Every structure is written in structure tokens, then in C-alpha cells.
Regions:
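Short acidic/histidine-rich active-site segments
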Residues: 209-213, 231
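Conserved phosphate/anionic-ligand binding catalytic regions in large, soluble enzymes, centered on
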Residues: 23, 27
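Alpha/beta enzyme core
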Residues: 4-12, 28-53, 60-77, 86-203, ...
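Active-site glycine-centered loops adjacent to acidic/histidine catalytic or metal-binding residues
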Residues: 85, 208
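Extended, intrinsically disordered, low-complexity segments
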Residues: 247-289
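Short, solvent-exposed beta-strand-terminating loops
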Residues: 237-240
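Generic N-terminal amphipathic, Lys/Arg-enriched alpha-helix
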Residues: 4-21, 257-259
């Protein structure tokens, strides 16, 4: 099945009251694990790629070609969107030209008018190519590829204004952060989410920083209009822990345990484990049947 944009999967998620997971990929193993899990669980999925990960994997074209080829060779039949995560103005255009089916243009650090102008331009180019666009209001806290945000709560009026640019998905800050949540985190601001949803209407909402948010908060956010949830750090932590245990147990010194395919297997299996947990939590299992 070829790549799809996020429009149809977001619409179905909104109507079905579930969310689609957007899981960041960092290499072939990451991609393989997420695609396998989505196929096994019959779940739609979005593969998120940060600009840093694109650079690590040597470029947008390499990532797009790899994902497309893997979908074909693995006989993946569930809907898969390849999505640029927190893209710059320049990065979003590069991703679109490389064949990404969805992009996030993060202009939240620009003055509002400049953000709106740049967003309109990205929307026009993306829609011409059949791709979808996500935009953000209210900086998400934590760190994302070296960019540190303060975890602002989005202004409903700014959300409404940004919706007017023609975007397909809206990421609105509601106290969520990237990375690990600190012990003193106050939780998601559901009052703010309700106000945003009331103002923007039927546009699918996006929750960034899905790592470590309690299940009850996740489910409540979905009930209030969240249709896409980003997960990155949690996959990294599961991968790291499984790989560390393999090495600490001396498995890499047994036979050909040093073979990269064996060395990376426990971490890859761990990614599948957490992706399954998240897909079940988000309610997307079986929604691609």
C-alpha cells in the first residue's frame, strides 16, 4: 500500500473517538518495528521524522525512499503516513519534495503574522502535492532536537486564526512537554483543551509529548478531540533499556552476539512492545481492518 496523507485517518479517528499514534523513527530498525506492529494490530500509523533524524539518516529522500520500499517489501496493508515532525519552513518544503505525505510546520516561534503567512504557503504547496499539514500554537515544553520550549498553553483565538490558514491538524500546547515529565508536572490543562476545541470546531487536534502521560489523561484528551498523539522518548527509553540489559548480561560476548542484527534485536523488540501498548491505549487497534 502506498503512503497516504493523514486526512482520512484523522477524519476516521475523530468520528471513531480514538487517536492515531505518530511514532518517531531513527533508523531502519525503528521503522521495521513500528510497521510490523501496526500491521499485526491492524492499526493506522504515522511515522514521525524530526529534522535531526532526517540529517542522521542522510537526507529526506533517503528516508522517504526507505519507508516506501519497506512498506512494499514487508507487504504492509494498513494506512501509513510519513510525517515531518517539528519542521522548519525550509525543512517542510524539502520533505514535501522528497515525497513525505504529511508535514508539520512549526512556526510557533515566529510572530503570529509571520507564522500565518509561512503556514499558508506550506499549506498551498502541501495540498498541491496531496500532502497534509500540521501547525502549532503554544510552544510545547521540554526539548526537541535542541529546541527548548516552556510548555505554554495555547490561546484559543490564535488557534482559530491558525485554523484559517487551511491546515489539516492543529497542535495546541496544553501543558504537555517533550521528553520525560518531571515529578512536579501539573498535568494536562483540560479546561484549556475544551476552550480550544470549542473555538476551532472539527479540526483534528494533536497532542505532542505522549511519553509518560497517564492513561486516564490520554483517554480524556481523546474524548475532547485529540486525534493524533506523538510518541518518541518512550520508544528510545525502551530501546535503551533492552539494549543495555543485553550487553550487561554479556550476550554480545557469546558466540556471534556481537552481530549488529543480534545486538539490536532486543531493543527493536522492545520498541514493538511499547508501540503495541500505546496503540491499545489510543484505541487504534483494529481500525485499519
Amino acid at each position: 500500500m502506498p503512503l497516504v496523507n493523514a486526512k482520512d485517518m484523522m477524519q476516521k479517528a475523530m468520528e471513531g473517538h480514538y487517536a492515531v499514534g505518530a511514532f518517531n523513527i531513527n533508523n531502519l530498525e525503528w521503522t521495521k518495528a513500528i510497521l510490523q506492529t501496526a500491521q499485526e494490530l491492524k492499526s493506522p500509523v504515522m511515522l514521525g521524522v524530526s529534522e535531526g533524524a532526517n540529517k542522521y539518516m542522510t537526507g529526506y529522500n533517503v528516508v522517504a525512499d526507505m519507508v516506501k520500499a519497506m512498506i512494499k517489501s514487508m507487504n504492509i496493508t494498513v494506512p501509513v503516513a510519513l510525517h515531518l515532525d517539528h519542521g522548519t519552513y525550509e525543512g517542510a518544503q524539502k520533505a514535501l519534495l522528497a515525497g513525505y505525505s504529511s508535514v508539520m510546520f512549526d512556526g510557533s516561534h515566529y510572530p503570529l503574522e509571520e507564522n500565518l503567512a509561512k503556514t499558508r504557503d506550506i499549506v498551498a504547496k502541501a495540498h498541491f502535492l496531496g500532502a497534509t499539514v500540521e501547525a502549532e500554537v503554544g510552544t510545547i515544553g521540554g526539548e526537541e532536537d535542541g529546541v527548548i520550549g516552556r510548555g505554554e498553553v495555547a490561546d484559543p483565538e490564535e488557534c482559530y486564526t491558525l485554523k484559517g490558514t487551511g491546515i489539516d491538524m492543529l497542535a495546541a500546547g496544553i501543558g504537555n512537554i517533550h521528553g520525560k515529565y518531571p515529578a512536579n508536572w501539573q498535568g494536562l490543562d483540560f479546561d484549556a483543551l475544551k476552550k480550544i476545541k470549542a473555538r476551532v470546531g472539527d479540526i483534528p487536534l494533536v497532542l505532542h509529548g505522549g511519553t509518560g502521560i497517564p492513561e486516564d489523561m490520554i483517554k480524556k484528551a481523546i474524548s475532547l478531540g485529540v486525534c493524533k498523539i506523538n510518541v518518541n522518548t518512550e520508544c528510545q527509553l525502551y530501546f535503551q533499556e533492552a539494549t543495555r540489559k543485553y550487553i550487561e548480561a554479556g550476550k554480545d560476548l557469546e558466540g556471534k552476539g556481537f552481530d549488529p542484527r543480534k545486538l539490536l534485536a532486543p531493543g527493536t523488540d522492545a520498541i514493538k512492545e511499547i508501540v503495541k501498548i500505546k496503540m491499545e491505549m489510543f484505541g487504534s487497534v483494529g481500525k485499519a481492518e
